[in-house]
Amino acid sequence: MAYLELKNVSFQYPNGYTAVENVSMEFEKGEKVAIIGQNGAGKTTTVKLMNGLLRPAKGEVLVGGTSTEKYTTAQIAKNVGYVFQNPDDQIFQDSIYKEIAFGLLKSGMGKAEIDKKVKETATLCGLENVLEEHPYNLSYSKRKFITIAAIVVMDPDVVILDEPTAGQDRDSTERLGKIMNWLTAKNKIVITITHDMEFVVKEFERVI
């Protein structure tokens, strides 16, 4: 049974441009799915509709069988985490630890549990030795792993990655693959927008 569904979804920007028209998709838990296509094909708009950053003009998005219209954007984001293409659009704290821990701190979780979760996630993302560093002491490509960690640590059911391999070297791309496999092993849905066909061939069985 699909956990995340788009049913006949359409979206038009205020300037009149129709970015998504009558799109239907289904995603089951434990799936790893690549979304490919030309620039301007509506890929990022589509995943923003999944995450609640945008709302459909027609059709509906269902998460766990419930329409996202019943939830605020913040409530949707707890279940559908979205890692932006540009990490600098999501980094606001003055240390990598604080950036990863931010959502947990807002949840009221105790410090010991936060420390444990942050360290586990930082290790997964190759950041365990730089937690006290300022995020901008790391390269642009490494900052992508900070934003991935900040989403993964919140344990959403769906993780959306927008062009995660852009600007990454081979080792970093391999780490991305390991992170995605770790997530799907936990029965999470991983949806990745990418133009990296080598990455698609290596990591994905399902491509949209």
Predicted regions and their residues:
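The feature captures the beta-strand-to-loop junction immediately N-terminal to the Walker
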Residues: 36-38
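H-loop/switch region of ABC-family ATPase nucleotide-binding domains
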Residues: 194-195
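Helix-to-loop junction immediately C-terminal to a conserved catalytic motif
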Residues: 51
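Conserved ABC ATPase signature
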Residues: 134-138
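Conserved ABC ATPase "signature" region
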Residues: 112-130
